[in-house]
Amino acid sequence: LPDLSQSAEPDKILYEKAVSDLQKGRHEIGRLTLQTLINTYQDSEYLAKAKLAIADSFYDEGTTSSLTQAVAEYKDFKTFFEFLDEASYAQYRIGMAHFRRMEKPDRDRTQAKLAEQEFQDFVLKYPENKLLTDAEQRLREVQEVLAEGDFRIARFYFLKDTDNARRAAILRLSEIVDRYPLYSQADRSLWMLGDALAKNEKTQHLAPRYFARIVQDYPQSSYVDEAKAQLVRMNVPVPQPSPDALARLQREKEMNREKAGLVRRALG
């Protein structure tokens, strides 16, 4: 008699076969095997692993359509297995799938916006997770791209220096300084915003708050002296740097020292 057990492979064998195929780049074959496992052994201990492996296989393929499918699969995983530790990994990968599809600052912003939302969700939902530092760094990179896109438009209007153009610049710059405080040109954005507001009698009373923010939040900025001079000219008290800004500067100095130490050790 034939060995019937061979015609109905147990879930473990199916899973291991699929993983082997995926590791060898046979993504479609691996996914078919995993789907067979999911459909056949609905109470299997490998069910969650199989769902996640399908999502990972699409992510690893890396094409536009595959990354789109990966997002759908990771979201499906989270729906069914939100209670598992791997749900945080799935959330991170959703953000990364959008991150990998991001365009340059002056191109379509759809994927960058989606990546920003997913990484923000990760930071809020998993504040103690081991992937938090990576998620925060990716979020900062995404926001740099979004802010840079807005800044280029704002600068275009700012340099036109007409009333209508200044109004358009003010709208863009206001969003940058409120939404993206870690943007590499946040201090310059504050300066441009204060300058644009100061040139209109109806808005000049708003300008000091933005010059003050340069002094408070970006004490090492090249715009600090000019911002202080503007505040004095407007008879507004010059504030001190905020404790948060000083703490951030200290952290950055320590990180730079660590990087320098690593370079020195690498060079011998």
Segments from the language model and where they lie:
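Acidic, polar-rich low-complexity tracts and alpha-helical solenoid repeat scaffolds
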Residues: L1-G268
